[in-house]
Amino acid sequence: MKNNTTEDLSLIKLPKPVFSHCSTVLEALKMRRTYRAISNKKIPLQILSDILWAAQGVNRVHGPFGGPGRTAGSASNSQEISVYVAKEEGTYLYEPDSHTMTPVAAGDNRSLAIGPGQRTSGANAPVRFIYVVDVDKFKTAGYQEPGLYDLEVQKSYYFVDTGLIAQNVYLATSALGLVSWFHNCNKTKLAKILRLKPHQRALFGQTIGYADE
């Protein structure tokens, strides 16, 4: 890994998502699979844009409680999960409202976006997503249900909300001719590399790419 400053990285403005792909939801479900043998073939920026939008992009300006609505639901529209994108040159934070990728750490951190005992699978994949929760966002959610302040309830919510995003990624990659794999990550090292705050924590990773067949 290189020094994790971001001086050599720039904000990436993603192209608008393309909605003309021919696969239906049922076809994507039929093709959905967890696949670990992923090649190093680069993912075009348009395809990455489409997958990120599917993950948790803005699909309506006025969602629950007045804020923008996203493709993946969340508890009381808390939107407490963020998607980080680990690529060879650096790691970026996906910003749904502007549909951009903001650099947060330079260098190749893809090996940290997977559990220590899983590194040989999909090791050459061009992209790994990292799912990070910010539990403070529960306190500012639109609907202040008492459960949002209960730590165990919070945990159940953010695990489910992460799963909703990950399933969107599974369906998008299936529809676009790619494969993906949802897995663990190196939570301790990612917290340092991504400069996470005490109320943030890395939860899971998801490897994205083309099947190595």
Predicted regions and their residues:
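N-terminal amphipathic, basic helical "cap/leader" segment at the start of enzyme domains
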Residues: 2-127
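Short, surface-exposed helix-loop/turn micro-motifs enriched in polar/charged residues
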Residues: 75, 181-182, 198
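Flexible internal linker/loop segments at domain or repeat junctions
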Residues: 144-146
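Small-aliphatic-rich amphipathic alpha-helix that forms the alpha element of a beta-alpha
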Residues: 32, 51, 83, 125-140, ...
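A short, structure-level motif marking secondary-structure boundaries and short turns
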Residues: 10-11, 19, 153-155, 204, ...
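Secreted/extracellular ectodomain signature
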Residues: 1-2, 197
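A glycine-rich helix N-cap at a beta->alpha junction
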Residues: 194-213
